[in-house]
């Protein structure tokens, strides 16, 4: 089967010129050149919304017009009179198929025009890229997909009689015009020449590859005031269709370079143990903690500048120590306390708290050594059921031998308010007698430091001397229904219980829901708090007030109800 030879391009493709003789005997030559060829377009379709659905041909076609004047017998010496020639020009664009097709017998003309938009353009005299007249078509759309080419027709309106054609009759300028009777228009248009563009493809909406960036010619024309839409980025196809080889514009690289701008920044999601607290001086974090180090930090008295509140400072295994007072202790002390870390260390590296070997002058007056009375309040504000603050949920790592899970008493949550005092033998004896029936639970200061072992007796050696709180912990008491400190409605016990020594107290029973120091201007060394090492909760101060004062109940942010005694009126 013989192959069909390729179609020859028309003679007036891309460039076309024509000459004529004027009345003065001058030879005028018109030259049209398609400076910017159309390459692609998206079919806008037909229907009610097609007028609003404009899909312009990309890039917009630009046709250049230049006019030359010469002697009829000398074509070598031509003068460019494009700017000096006095006439009106406009260019009319039509659409035709790239491959002519024979009309069938039963097929009629198309019901609707295939080319839409603005097919007419006036001349614009520009200085760049060169001095000439330019026709710009920024709003041309094609309704159906296929292979087409544009045909541009130049029309001229003559203003000077001397520039008219040689064979045309002379118009009668002196004839009077009758305004009452309509007459034919005096001005008329002359067709000069036609130029065609190269074939371009109109794609369907699914196959349309997209729009490329505006060309340099479009930018130059737009800079001189012409109406041309400028695209500064590639708007290529966003779908994943397979690209054809006849289209060179590929947006895979363009979208690959800027895909990170629109991607959710979740490439690195650090856990709570990896996120160091901003106020911490350490750069490492112990990942063995069940809770993140930044979730345990709460504002303490030292953070607010209250350094003189020494009764709030106590020694606990869960408290962190600053590295400053560490060198004053002996190496044996460091070796004794080097194996225990606190969940409140805020990511500090190997912080120890030498409790039994306190110097004569308390070293915990600095803000870094001040014990914050908010140990685990940040992650537990709900009522405790007795098993919430065990060896694992209180912030301690479970495998550590320092805090056995089967310990019968004296857990972190079961400790009453403590007070840090200089080492005194009588106070230590009184504390051991009042706190527990086991005399070996708390060693004296004369006991030499021994290596720590995972036993309950050795675990208590890290506790400082204790001081009995006067008035509240002198004897165990069970709140009853007749007691004014027992809430019948909610069943909450307003005072701490100390009689259940063999069972672990809950966090609420030990600390209370509102036990926070330095609130409402209260101080621990005031007269209404004698010999108190730590501020009681508000309902724990009920015995110090008279029964005639009213109670105030309000709801906290976590939804719990809190009762307070109204202040005395002057």
Swiss-Prot record:
Record-annotated Velvet domain positions: 25-231
GO BP terms in the entry: asexual sporulation resulting in formation of a cellular spore; conidiophore development; negative regulation of conidiophore development; negative regulation of sexual sporulation resulting in formation of a cellular spore; positive regulation of asexual sporulation resulting in formation of a cellular spore; positive regulation of gliotoxin biosynthetic process; spore germination; sporulation resulting in formation of a cellular spore
Localization: Nucleus; Cytoplasm
Residue interval(s) of motif Nuclear localization signal: 39-44
Entry's Gene Ontology cellular component terms: cytoplasm; nucleus
Bias-annotated ranges (Basic and acidic residues): 505-526
Deletion consequences: Reduces sporulation capacities on nitrate-containing medium. Results in the abundant formation of conidiophores. Leads to a reduction of gliotoxin production. Decreases the production of fumagillin, fumitremorgin G, fumigaclavine C and Glionitrin A. Also reduces protease activity.
Location of the region described as Disordered in the Swiss-Prot/TrEMBL record: 1-24, 39-60, 266-491, 504-541
Start-end of Low complexity biased regions: 315-335
Entry keywords, A to Z: Cytoplasm, Nucleus, Sporulation, Transcription, Transcription regulation
Keyword Cytoplasm: yes
Ranges annotated as biased composition (Polar residues): 278-287, 336-354, 363-395, 427-445
Region (PEST), start-end ranges: 454-493
Domain notes: The C-terminal PEST domain is a region rich in proline, glutamic acid, serine and threonine residues that is required for the light-dependent regulation of development and secondary metabolism.
Family: Belongs to the velvet family. VeA subfamily.
Subunit structure: Component of the heterotrimeric velvet complex composed of laeA, veA and velB; VeA acting as a bridging protein between laeA and velB.
Described purpose of this protein according to its UniProt entry: Component of the velvet transcription factor complex that controls sexual/asexual developmental ratio in response to light, promoting sexual development in the darkness while stimulating asexual sporulation under illumination. The velvet complex hat acts as a global regulator for secondary metabolite gene expression. Controls the expression of hundreds of genes, including those comprising more than a dozen known secondary metabolite gene clusters. Controls the expression of the gliotoxin gene cluster.
Protein name: Developmental and secondary metabolism regulator veA
Protein source organism: Aspergillus fumigatus (strain ATCC MYA-4609 / CBS 101355 / FGSC A1100 / Af293)
Name of the coding gene: veA
